[in-house]
């Protein structure tokens, strides 16, 4: 087996800790460092017990080391990542950004990962985007010859307890960023995103509804087949991602603006590595980030013949 790409995790919170467990299972990535700013962080303590080198002295400590990582996964804040990104680039370190910073292109693995494998910095968009944009992409490609998807709307419902203060403070940014991704990555000419923080107790797992307007004469079997194919692709890195039922097709109506519509319902159950299974919205972010990192590492190691 070729050598693994070395990895640093910047951030020591819940998402970083869940990401750590996924990276430890990878055949292509070797997590060696976790960087935080709180010496009492549970994430840093767990990482130390698992054999990683840890620090609470921040990114500058990492960059001062003689041995530097091939990849950095950052799960801090947009402000922190925007400041750190130029430093990573100057050091020749590829960055996978789990913050809203969007320094580099947004990546949703089934839709556009291959396009950005050489990018020095990639962004994981939003949890709602990772869960729903693959479906919009699946529908868009199935009707591309008929003019594509004129409008797509996604509704992401997540357990309220899984949404931290950062998510709550940035709901508007979430909807704006996800809506843009529905268009630029999913392929819809116009997109809209809605997020619901579900207060149910016990917490409900993430559930998403995806509405796509389609040409009235579109091949519905082809659309359904495309959706199933993309769902299977997502399941390779998020086993808890699944359709709740078959795609539902509706004829043009006043409510749909005179357009035919396909509606897809999905749910996302987390793997329970560190975060609880109901936090599928967070799990899909760490799983997708791991997938992106593995694909980058595979390409890099193949080019270098397994030598770093």
Curated annotation (Swiss-Prot):
MF-aspect GO terms: acetaldehyde dehydrogenase (acetylating) activity; NAD binding
Binding site for NAD(+): 12-15, 162-170, 281
Gene3D superfamilies linked: Dihydrodipicolinate Reductase, domain 2, NAD(P)-binding Rossmann-like Domain
Family: Belongs to the acetaldehyde dehydrogenase family.
Enzyme nomenclature, EC number: 1.2.1.10
Gene source species: Mycobacterium marinum (strain ATCC BAA-535 / M)
Name of the protein in question: Acetaldehyde dehydrogenase 2
Top-level EC class: oxidoreductase
Record keywords, A-Z: Aromatic hydrocarbons catabolism, NAD, Oxidoreductase
BP term (GO), one: catabolic process
Domain of life: Bacteria
Catalytic activity: acetaldehyde + NAD(+) + CoA = acetyl-CoA + NADH + H(+)
Name of a matching Pfam family: Semialdhyde_dh
Active site: 127 (acyl-thioester intermediate)
């Amino acid at each position: 087996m070729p050598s693994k790409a070395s990895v640093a995790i910047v951030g020591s919170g819940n998402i970083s800790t869940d990401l750590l467990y996924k990276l430890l299972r990878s055949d292509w990535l070797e997590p060696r460092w976790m960087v935080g700013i709180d010496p009492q962080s549970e994430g840093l303590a767990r990482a130390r017990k698992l054999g990683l080198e840890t620090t609470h002295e921040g990114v500058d400590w990492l960059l001062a080391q003689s041995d530097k990582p091939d990849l950095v996964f950052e799960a801090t804040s947009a402000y922190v990542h925007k400041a750190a990104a130029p430093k990573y680039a100057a050091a020749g370190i590829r960055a996978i950004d789990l913050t809203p910073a969007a320094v580099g292109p947004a990546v949703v693995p089934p839709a556009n990962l291959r396009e950005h494998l050489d990018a020095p910095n990639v962004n994981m968009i939003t949890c709602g985007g990772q869960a729903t944009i693959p479906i919009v992409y699946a529908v868009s490609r199935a009707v591309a010859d008929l003019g594509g998807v004129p409008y797509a709307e996604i509704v992401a419902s997540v357990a309220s307890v899984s949404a931290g203060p950062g998510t709550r403070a940035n709901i508007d940014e979430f909807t704006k960023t996800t809506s843009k991704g529905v268009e630029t990555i999913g392929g819809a000419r116009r997109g809209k995103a809605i997020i619901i923080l579900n207060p149910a107790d016990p917490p409900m797992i993430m559930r998403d509804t995806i509405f796509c307007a389609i040409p009235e004469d579109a091949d519905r079997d082809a659309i359904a087949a495309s959706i199933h194919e993309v769902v299977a692709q997502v399941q390779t890195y998020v086993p808890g991602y699944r359709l709740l039922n078959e795609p539902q097709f509706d004829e043009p109506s006043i409510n749909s603006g005179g357009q035919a519509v396909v509606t897809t319902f999905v749910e996302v159950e987390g793997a329970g590595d560190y975060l609880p299974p109901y936090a599928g919205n967070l799990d899909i972010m760490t799983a997708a980030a791991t997938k992106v990192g593995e694909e980058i590492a595979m390409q890099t190691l193949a080019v270098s013949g397994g030598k770093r």
